[in-house]
Regions:
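ATP-dependent carboxylate-amine ligase
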Residues: 1-166
Length: 166
């Protein structure tokens, strides 16, 4: 009833609990400096509340920032690091500045496929992964690839007769 029955809107802080024990937070619908700062703070706070899960920020470009685009992306990387985020995976030419600002623990990718492949290789229990970027960065495709990978793992586990398959 009411708020208890409310479902999050796709791409707006929607949480997915993956079979591997990863919490995937899909905030891929859009990004601007204010919403990104708030999402970083929410990720850091949720980690503290959940016993120190390893936190990952997967960031696509924030667009339409004009002459401030590079400094704002640098700030995003620095803010994520200062908030205690463990890793930053960045996609797109603007987000390269975020990776630079973050420093150790950051990687920059040129394609969605490269980023998704690298992230899938690192997924493990106790991770909280926030995906965020402007609509034009199409970060929802990263979320879709992670969810498809999780569904494929569930089907494989079910075929093997594993009890936990869902």
């Amino acid at each position: 009833d009411g708020l208890d029955a409310a479902q999050p809107v796709a791409g707006r802080l929607a949480s997915h609990h993956l079979r591997s024990g990863v919490v995937l937070v899909d905030d891929s619908y859009n990004a601007n400096p204010g919403s990104l700062d708030a999402a970083i703070e929410a990720l850091a706070a949720s980690t503290s509340a959940n016993g120190g899960d390893e936190t990952w920020l997967v960031l696509g470009d924030m667009r339409e920032l004009g002459a401030d685009e590079r400094p704002m992306h640098l700030h995003a990387g620095r803010h994520a690091k200062a908030a205690g985020i463990a890793h930053l995976y960045a996609l797109g030419p603007l987000s390269a500045a975020a990776a630079e600002g973050f420093g150790d623990g950051a990687r920059h990718f040129n394609t969605h496929a490269e980023l998704a492949e690298a992230l899938i290789a690192r997924l493990g229990a106790g991770m909280r992964v926030l995906v965020k970027g402007s609509r034009g960065s199409a970060m929802d495709s990263i979320v879709k690839q992670l969810l498809q990978h999780d569904a494929a793992n569930a089907r494989l586990a079910k075929a093997r007769g594993e009890v936990d398959a869902a």
